[in-house]
């Protein structure tokens, strides 16, 4: 489970797959991008302020070790899904729902691709709500971090979501540290939202 690798202060090398552009019609579609290589690059040893008033956490992992995962696309105006056999990463996150449940005969992870157009958002929500698996759980990764927490890093930040193979939900704050370079500002395990509450939020 890669949540043990993506601990606070861990440095990673990674190029996020590009956002996929398709017709924005609310459809539920399979994710198309493969995962790009993510590698552990030690720990961030720079002077910390705010969130980082603590010693660096050292994770015993060889430098340049791969961090294996499946990538789930964000497809604006659609809900993308991927079959879950391993840990799944997706992002960057702003306000989208990430969900997990049985769909088309197997366990899937979903990224509901909301956009700034409310008409399209209503389509996306209505379509996904109608197909919401009976065992669905979900979370909103961006809600895990406050503006103050992000500002305390003194870095440009983005959020990625992790759904572990065992069904755990995590929100990971990434701090930009150069082209293709990040360090983990923090990781939070997020309690799942269950189907009745998801239905209400998608109404």
Regions found by a protein language model. Name each.
Residues 1-203:
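Active-site microenvironment for binding and transforming phosphate-containing groups
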